[in-house]
Amino acid sequence: MGTIIESQATTVSKFAAGACFYQLGYTGIVLLLEVIAADFSNLNYRLLASFVPALPFIINTWISGNITTAVGTRWKWGIGMWAFILPLSCIPLGICLLHMRWLAHRDEETKKQLDQVENEWKIPRSWNQFWDVYVMDLFIWKLDFIGLFLSCVTFGCILVPFTLAGGLQRQWRTAHIIVPEVIGWVIALPLYIIWETKFARMPLTPWDLIKDRGILFALIIAFFINFIWYMQGDYMYTVLVVSVNETIKSATRITSLYSFVSVITGTILGVFIIKFRRTKPFIMFGASMWFLSFGLLVHFRGDTNSHSGIIGSLCLLGFGAGFFTYTTQASIQASAKTHEKLAVITALYLATYNIGSALGGAISGAIWTQVLPREISKRLKNETLSADAYGSPFTFIYQYPWGSPERVSVTQAYKHVQKILCIVGLCFCVPLLLCTFMLRNYRLADSVTLDEDEKEHGNYTTDGKYAEDDGYDSDTATMKQRFVRMFQ
């Protein structure tokens, strides 16, 4: 529905409405796939299973440029075609799930459990029962609609004005920028915290789980992954076309290299972890690779001499991501320990991941809109031409070919703003790496959760500390031993 609305939109507001529906469905699909992967795999196979839905990136990298070029300016068709491509691609999984449901009904014990669940959620005939069961119990309390609404208002009011303010300083003094910020910080955020801590029966943020450092720091890493990526990647396509003189096909493929390399690296790592059964060393290594990658991106950020450097930097960025993005998800799922908490922790991880995307997009958009117009105007010294270069860069590059004085000036402006974005990303790599030291390093068992494995082998203690079968005693350990243990 979202893609149909977007493809037929004639105004920004209609397109935004379609984007909301699209994002709602997309997030649901991603969460469902990750929960299925987690529910159908043992912990030591979890990383490999998590990468299965991402394997198409290996193909998408090389065909996306051709598709983008073929679509051209027919943007409505470019969006609308996914309204039937995506449902068709879901048919094999749907058939598989229906077949498994049919097999479950053939087993008497499983059939009784399914019938019991169906009876619990059977639609009541009376309105009063429907209101109590579906509206109040499910919608308000179990789905925590009020908490979800307050969180959306909070992040929307805080983040959107960063980009809407544009490159004009006077915009920050206008009501349509100030009022949303005040509502977000002063009203919505406190209300969200109060609701989640005092009134919500099943809060979006399970505070009892977040107290575990294995979960807390994994969530912080999830936030930083997309936040840092957006610093370099949000406007990379525009930089490649305008500032590096890449074609549409080439720019599309280059921006996809990150996903291509990360999926290949992560899949190979997933096979290796089946036997190695540890995640923390690989997460630390992958995060450290981002330092080197962003350092290269600070250097290679514009003109034709940066072509190979940007490709190498993005490949290195994807190489590092393959070691720690999905691996961190496997780590936090291991920290969840019980089957009941697995879906909650996975959903919380993906939610934090998307919050990082939102904040990263807002900050990168703010830097772009605040710095780039000023830099272009300073170099071109022509307000009309500067407005065209900033507002319609892809039209501008056809009017002023590569090597012309105007194009050179705009290229320098793009190089400057991309340097700022990459430096910001490089700075935030520091807390990202520090958080990897604070993760737990559980041994991934041949079971869906550590709770199941603990009942058979006793591999971890109930208070969340490591098993004490290697000589470590949490009751008699010295401060030095505790400090060293924190990073293991």
Question: Residue locations for each model-derived region?
Answer:
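Interfacial helix-cap and linker-helix signal at transmembrane-aqueous boundaries
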Residues: 4-6, 15, 65-74, 162, ...
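Membrane-helix boundary/linker segments in multi-pass transporters
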Residues: 156-251
